[in-house]
A protein has these predicted regions:
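Catalytic cores of nucleotide-sugar-dependent glycosyltransferases that transfer UDP/GDP/TDP-activated
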Residues: 1-182
Length: 182
């Protein structure tokens, strides 16, 4: 199966491969432009766009493969755009009710990039690019966006969860993390 999605000024191919192993289905997103190579982090300036593409592709392919998850667990900045995109997809009944969890493994890496580059790559409304959403000290922050829009925020341990709510370890996001504590 495949579809095409809008990425900035062009359409990008989204292929999906399915593998069933021990009764569990795995899906793999395919795209030669973004994923042709032997390293997941290849070209630093393309990484943000690559993971924005991946996040949008994950959600966009779901109706095609007829898979509607109850919860999507997003890990670090690389999948931070998923909860943001999911919010933009809410006019489509297929996506209504899907929940997200944003899991933080290392707060040091936030997917912080040039504001205009992210805005262009994501192709979403200005509404999402304010200081209470994706904007972060005049840049755009993909992890912050995921944290704002996810239904829940989790970390790798309760100790880490407490540490990152402090100014010392919160990497500038401690107030948001305090507000999202459950």
């Amino acid at each position: 199966d495949h579809i095409y999605i809008d990425m900035a000024w062009r359409k990008q191919y989204v292929g999906v491969f399915e593998l069933e192993y021990n009764g569990c289905k795995f899906y793999f997103i395919d795209n030669e432009f973004y994923f042709n190579g032997d390293k997941p982090y290849d070209f630093i300036h393309l990484d943000c766009e690559k993971f924005i593409f991946f996040s949008k592709a994950v959600l966009s392919i779901l109706p095609t493969i007829d898979f509607r998850p109850d919860v999507i667990n997003c890990n670090d900045w690389q999948t931070g755009p998923i909860p943001v995109f999911l919010d933009t997809f809410q006019d489509n009944p297929f996506y209504q009710g899907i929940k997200t969890v944003m899991t933080i493994h290392n707060l040091k890496f936030q997917g912080r990039w040039d504001f205009n580059k992210i805005k262009d790559a994501m192709g979403i409304s200005d509404y999402y690019f304010t200081s209470d959403k994706l904007e972060f000290y005049k840049d755009a922050n993909l992890l912050k966006g995921g944290m704002v829009y996810a239904n829940k925020v989790s970390t790798v341990s309760s100790t880490y969860a407490n540490e990152i709510t402090t100014e010392e370890y919160g990497e500038g996001l401690h107030n948001l993390l305090r507000a999202r504590q459950n």
